[in-house]
């Protein structure tokens, strides 16, 4: 997809997120994650010889500016907004070309980031954040839209290629071709008929799609909470189980 340009980088609240945010504010930390807090505290104590726990870096990809708000290509940004709202984190700092917010999930330090470089140059920001804060790549979760997944479905992977996504391609390039970072792919479905995918990803959602996407954000928030406290594998199990149960209940 071609690099888009010319939009303001200001953050404007998205009506699409209202229901998801309302749910997120009331959503409890999973019971298994709560039980893990003691283990997390123990890990922090073990790092007490001058070291400190490295934060998880949760990155959502998108294009800045009002014109792109609420479009399919920006679901990564919207996922970050849901997490920030639920965990009381303000993305009030601009660092390394990204809107950044720092906080905690339980005892786990986290950092949220929305690169403001436009999608196709996301790596310029992510590469600098990873390098400056010395974050291990297995603690860098990148969240973005995926044309090849059914709408509102999630796929959590420990590593992989860019799959044709230019934002992820840019990140890999700026990490010196290292692909060993997890990613949460958020399905936006395929374009209808012969529509150009580059145009499709800039389309807004209809009301029914918004409702489905709210549930996807709900699952994504839960997955992030579990990942921060219990690790990638537990989070992946949750995502797979939640979606399997949803299909059985239809």
Curated annotation (Swiss-Prot):
Transit peptide: 1-45
NCBIfam families, alphabetized: pth
GO CC annotations, alphabetized: mitochondrion
Pfam assignment, any one: Pept_tRNA_hydro
Alphabetical keyword list: Hydrolase, Mitochondrion, RNA-binding, Transit peptide, tRNA-binding
Enzyme class name: hydrolase
Organism: Oryza sativa subsp. japonica
Annotated site residue numbers, Stabilizes the basic form of H active site to accept a proton: 145
Localization per Swiss-Prot or TrEMBL: Mitochondrion
Secretion signal, residue range per the UniProt entry: none
Binding site for tRNA: 68, 118, 120, 166
EC numbers, comma separated: 3.1.1.29
Residues at the catalytic site: 73
Catalytic activity: an N-acyl-L-alpha-aminoacyl-tRNA + H2O = an N-acyl-L-amino acid + a tRNA + H(+)
Family under the similarity heading: Belongs to the PTH family.
Record protein name field: Peptidyl-tRNA hydrolase, mitochondrial
Main location: mitochondrion
Described function: The natural substrate for this enzyme may be peptidyl-tRNAs which drop off the ribosome during protein synthesis.
GO molecular function: peptidyl-tRNA hydrolase activity; tRNA binding
